[in-house]
Design a protein with these regions (language model features):
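Extended, compositionally simple hydrophobic/Ser/Thr-rich segments
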Residues: 44-56, 101, 108-239
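Short acidic/polar N-terminal linker immediately downstream of export determinants
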Residues: 2-13, 19-73, 84-104, 119-121, ...
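Short, ordered coil/turn segments that flank beta-strands lining enzyme active or ligand-binding pockets
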Residues: 81
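Secretory-pathway extracellular proteins and peptide precursors enriched for disulfide-bonded cysteines
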Residues: 15-16, 133
Length: 239
């Protein structure tokens, strides 16, 4: 009798659990996909969170467009203050769909990505200003070319890939963050890595590297000036 009762419970509970599991993971926004142009300008920094796929390119005029399910696209807020374009949702909802965002602007200074945002930046190779990139959460970004100087701050499980050339690459990496810059020719590199982070850099003249915790800094090149500091299991390794 007890065995039959347990079987009956399993037959009732299992479909219910499967339904709840599916309901938690399905995309709640089944509205039609739209393209929406956004009338914003006067910014040189971009901040974005949530689940956006952001593509940024250099152009002579400002242009911003979002593509995705209508309900989600129409719930995005676009605010400009202190030269920052801040992209967020007005209302928090789990399991948002990925929204594609295209941004064109003449001058680009800083990118802040958080959450599960992915980003691609192109067209700013050789820019005379410092390009600053801040990644947190599980964000990922690719820079196809960068400015004369590039500053980075990578934390969480974020990952930055950079190619091109620059006079100086400097900044901090922590947590499980990753910097992949073997394809970026840098005259000078000044990197501090901590936690379980990893950095891969290419340097020609000057290397300043500090690795703590279980972090690793891998470098290619034979810089004449090297200032290397390690502690707590951190390593700086020539490739």
């Amino acid at each position: 009798m007890k065995s039959k009762l347990n079987q009956l419970k399993s037959r009732v509970l299992l479909p219910s659990l499967l339904f709840l599991l599916f309901a938690c993971h399905k995309n709640p926004d089944n509205s039609p996909v739209i393209e929406k142009e956004i009338n914003v300008n006067g910014f040189n920094k971009v901040y974005a969170g949530e689940r956006f796929n952001v593509t940024i390119t250099k152009g002579t005029v400002f242009y911003v467009k979002a593509t995705g399910p209508a309900n989600s696209v129409n719930d995005i807020t676009w605010s400009v203050a202190n030269n920052i374009l801040d992209i967020q949702y007005a209302h928090h909802e789990n399991n948002r769909p990925v929204i594609d965002i295209v941004i064109t602007l003449p001058l680009f200074v800083q990118l802040n990505l958080s959450g599960a945002v992915t980003g691609t930046v192109s067209g700013f190779q050789g820019a005379s200003n410092v390009l600053r990139t801040v990644l947190s959460g599980a964000s990922k970004c690719i820079f196809n070319g960068t400015g004369v100087n590039m500053q980075i701050d990578i934390s969480g499980a974020s990952e930055l890939n950079v190619n091109g050339s620059t006079e100086s690459l400097y900044g901090n990496i922590s947590g499980a963050g990753k910097l992949n810059a073997f394809d970026l020719a840098s005259t000078e590199v000044d990197i501090s890595a901590s936690g379980g982070s990893e950095a891969r850099v290419r340097v020609t003249d000057r290397l300043f590297a500090e690795a703590t915790g279980g972090s690793r800094i891998y470098y290619k090149g034979t810089p004449a000036v090297k200032n290397i500091q390690t502690s707590g299991g951190g390593q700086v390794i020539q490739q």
